[in-house]
C-alpha cells in the first residue's frame, strides 16, 4: 500500500507518523507533503528518511492508495480533486467536509462500514471531543437504546492550529 501524509510538519501530521508506526500500519511506500515552507524537510520513519514534497496541483497522488490530510480546511477543499482524481482515498482531519452529505463522517469504532461509501473519495472525521463521546455512546447504545443526549464541550485552542496556540499563550497572564 502506498500512503501519503499531507501536512506532515504540523502536530497532527507528526501524530499520523507516530500512530502509523506504533500500529505497524502496512505500507510499501510513504510520501510526505507540506507547504512551500515545509518542503525539503526530512523526517525519519521506520529507519528510513523521507523528504517533504511541496503540495501542488499536479499528478503526485497518482498511484497513492490513501492520503491522511491535516493541513487545514482551506487546503483540504482546494486540493480535494488533486488528491482524489486518480483514485486516492482522502482521509481528512479538518472540518472542511463534515457537513457534506456525500462525504461519510466516520469514527472507525462506531461506523466503519460508512467508509466504504465515499462517492467523492473523501472520508471525514468528527471533531475530537465528538469522537470520544460517540465511542462511549456506542457502547451504551449497544446495551440500551439512547433517546437523547445533551452535551456541552470546551474546545482546545490547539484545534485552531499553531497561530491560535501562540495567541492563547500570549493571552495568559
What are these regions (language model features)?
Residues 1-171:
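N-terminal Rossmann-like NAD(P) cofactor-binding subdomain of oxidoreductases
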Amino acid at each position: 500500500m502506498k500512503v501519503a501524509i499531507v501536512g506532515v510538519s504540523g502536530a497532527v501530521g507528526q501524530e499520523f507518523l507516530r500512530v502509523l508506526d506504533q500500529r505497524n500500519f502496512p505500507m510499501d511506500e510513504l510520501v510526505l507533503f507540506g507547504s512551500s515552507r515545509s518542503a525539503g524537510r526530512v523526517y525519519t520513519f521506520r529507519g528510513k528518511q523521507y523528504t517533504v514534497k511541496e503540495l501542488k496541483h499536479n499528478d503526485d497522488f497518482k498511484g497513492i492508495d490513501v492520503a491522511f490530510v491535516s493541513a487545514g480546511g482551506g487546503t483540504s477543499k482546494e486540493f480535494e480533486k488533486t488528491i482524489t482524481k486518480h483514485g486516492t482515498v482522502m482521509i481528512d482531519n479538518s472540518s472542511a467536509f463534515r457537513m457534506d452529505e456525500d462525504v461519510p463522517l466516520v469514527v472507525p469504532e462506531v461506523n466503519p462500514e460508512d467508509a466504504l461509501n465515499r462517492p467523492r473519495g473523501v472520508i471525514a472525521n468528527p471533531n475530537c471531543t465528538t469522537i470520544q463521546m460517540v465511542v462511549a455512546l456506542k457502547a451504551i447504545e449497544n446495551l440500551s437504546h439512547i433517546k437523547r443526549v445533551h452535551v456541552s464541550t470546551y474546545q482546545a485552542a490547539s484545534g485552531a492550529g499553531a497561530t491560535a496556540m501562540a495567541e492563547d499563550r500570549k493571552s495568559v497572564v
